[in-house]
């Protein structure tokens, strides 16, 4: 849900048979056939829905979703995701990327496989430097590779990463303090329903290449947020909170399972959120916060400035539907 200059963006999809994830309260949009991407914008007082250009996701029965968005200004925003598109020879899954120039969205050409390619998250540092990450899977080899794409202002280029596995691979979050200090987290999972083995994935970009680091927790990493080159935070599936000190990652505490988002405003102001859970760290101790009224889960976050924090999630207005929820604090 990242945005800048007080403008927040939420991305998701609209389904004909559901409300779709992350449609904020107060925003209205028609429910269209198939799974078509949707982008909502907060201008400081109201929500509105931005139109995307027609393309492969406009094809009947196409199922598309946008899962990451980031902007370095109100006139330079990139959104990424994936679409499953019907073709004459079958279904293909391809990565999606769109750019907002302050007036309209345009679709960007994404390099990579046409067999199975998806982008999950993006972070923009300037109009000529943004990174998108995801997974590229090959049906021929059975390998899943962590994908990293760099935007130079006019085109994407693929940058090699050290993560390749025959197991299932998920890339769950990206966060960086600069173009030479970027973190990506996720996990690999052995196939099957029983006795599955998880392995946490941590990658770091130093401005010239990606490196894989050892994680002290192997339940899978769900989110990461960097404060400085010597201070970054991550949340694991088993509730462990990890911290980077400039040299190594360590587990600093273990909270309840079900936490999926971590927001670090500073070294003394860290929030962890999840399913009916909100916990705050003040630099000394962790304190459980009152559950936001009516919200069942918080799953994403954006820090616009010190003390200006947004969470996105969902709630259940009835047993039949799931509705989006947005939580905002301007006090830190």
Residues covered by each model-derived region:
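Residue-level hotspots at or immediately adjacent to binding/recognition sites across diverse folds
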Residues: 1-332
